[in-house]
Amino acid sequence: ISVDVVGSTYEYIRYPYRWDNFNDRIRLLESVTRGKYDISYDFTCVPQLFNIENLGRLQRRLGANKLYMNNILHPDDNYNSLKMVPEHILETALKDIEYCTGSNILINSIKSLLANYSPPTVAQLKIMVKSIQVLDLHRKQHYKDYLEPHTRDFITESIRKVS
């Protein structure tokens, strides 16, 4: 089951889906399969700029060993890749995400990013800002209403920098 994050950030990443609907679908799946079928399921997510600050919460919500964090789906040059994440957010995520089979590759990637940290260039920030502005305009929403505080502040500061 693909899920990237909990709460309002889920609603931003998975627009137009609602977090409450996700919970309802999981409850339905559990009620249908409980004791009747031998069906097991796990969760997968794609770590990215928008959700890295929230992954520890997601992991605790779903169970660390039921969540596989696939960090290879966003190319490094993508505006939403982990290479765009500020150092302090990476450090916090590293402390917050539990080390287990489903997160070991991500944790090693974060450690590598921190060891070789280079802040995003102005050109990268411009691409990120433009992409977020296009998303928000198209969806008639605003990132400030959905994303976690440090990520939201980083985007706001980036908008100021490139304007």
PLM region spans:
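Radical SAM/AdoMet-radical enzyme domain recognition
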Residues: 1-72, 89
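Radical SAM enzyme core and accessory elements
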Residues: 101-163
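Acidic metal-coordinating catalytic centers involved in nucleic-acid phosphodiester chemistry
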Residues: 98
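Extended aliphatic helical segments
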Residues: 3-6, 32, 39, 46, ...
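Intrinsically disordered, low-complexity regions enriched in small/polar residues
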Residues: 12, 24, 45, 70, ...
